[in-house]
Design a protein with these regions (language model features):
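Bilobed periplasmic-binding protein-like "clamshell/Venus-flytrap" ligand-binding domains
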Residues: 1-12, 61, 149-160, 244-252
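Extracytoplasmic/periplasmic solute-binding protein
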Residues: 1-45, 51, 75, 84
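Short helices/loops that flank or line small-molecule/ion binding pockets
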Residues: 1-2, 71-87, 219, 223-226
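Glycine-centered hinge/linker elements that transmit conformational signals in sensory
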Residues: 35-67, 98, 112
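Extracytoplasmic/periplasmic substrate-recognition and gating elements
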Residues: 55-59, 99-168, 199
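Paired acidic/hydrophobic, glycine-rich loop segments that form the ligand-binding mouth/hinge
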Residues: 85-90, 108
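Beta->alpha turn/N-cap motifs
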Residues: 89-94, 126
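C-terminal capping/gating helix-and-loop segments adjacent to ligand/active sites or protein-protein/ligand interfaces
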Residues: 185-241
Length: 252
């Protein structure tokens, strides 16, 4: 109120973004057989909070409510224009915030929120892979071996401002090439969180049909937030959506 900022908090409108805090709250995402099991007590606890925050004004219905279905919507422009106090997003935002915000105001990254089960976000990002059908396997192998060396990775991460997947480098082995102290701190904060990422989050990120789960989660949760469904109805629809889409994929 003192700063006249209209939106206390915003999150990326995506199932991927919501899944990390849900896992922190105890969501398991899969059953004992490894099959998708999205709705459990952990997921309900996190989605209930998101629902409540939208009802009491902590989060703005106008942001998530401005799109439908599984459409992604970020709040990066609102945050860069000082219209949001706290923004839950990914490390890919850091370079553009350093460029767009500069020193217009102080912005500061904090670790992923903790729940009863973990302090975790979701892994993700880009990957450089070798194709098995290359006509030059020996040369490609040498290149990949060079790029995978700790020194090479440190230089690559430092220049590209990517968060390292290498656990040793993630705990302080990268000198990020930016003069912006806020961006450097943000990159170090995200890097330091890599070792604490939950195994459930890695399993979900690696699941080939995770998009089915992400889309069902965000689309049905949003319908509850804007008043089209109750939360209990949204949970039932999430499970129906996932079952139907997986059945369709099995026929492809």
């Amino acid at each position: 109120e003192k700063l006249d900022i209209p939106i206390p908090m915003a999150w990326d409108r995506s199932g991927h973004r919501v899944s990390g805090p849900a896992i922190a709250m105890g969501a398991q995402m899969f059953d004992a057989a490894g099959e998708p099991a999205l709705v459990d007590d952990g997921l309900k606890e996190m989605t209930q909070r998101l629902y409540d925050w939208h009802q009491d004004g902590t989060m703005s219905k106008e942001l998530w409510g401005s799109v439908s279905g599984s459409t992604y919507l970020g709040a990066n422009e609102d945050f860069a224009n000082a219209q949001v106090v706290m923004y839950m997003s990914g490390s890919w935002q850091i370079p553009q915030f350093a460029d767009k915000i500069g020193d217009a105001f102080d912005w500061w990254a904090v670790p992923a929120p903790c729940g009863a089960a973990a302090c975790t976000g979701m892994p993700g990002g880009a990957a450089l892979v070798a194709m098995k059908d290359t006509k030059h396997p020996a040369e490609v192998g040498k290149l990949m071996d060079f790029l995978a060396q700790e020194e090479s990775l440190a230089e690559f991460y430092g220049k590209t401002l990517f968060i390292p997947g290498h656990l040793k480098l993630a705990t302080g082995g990268v000198d990020f090439a930016t003069d912006d102290p806020r961006a450097k701190h943000a990159l170090q904060t995200f890097s330091g969180a890599v070792p604490t990422i939950s195994s459930v989050a890695f399993d979900l990120q690696g699941y080939k049909n995770n998009r089915v789960m992400f889309n069902a989660l965000i689309s049905r949760l949003n319908e509850a937030i804007v008043g089209e469904l109750t939360l209990d109805q949204a949970y039932a629809r999430m499970e129906e959506d996932i079952a139907n889409q997986l059945a369709e994929k099995a026929l492809e």
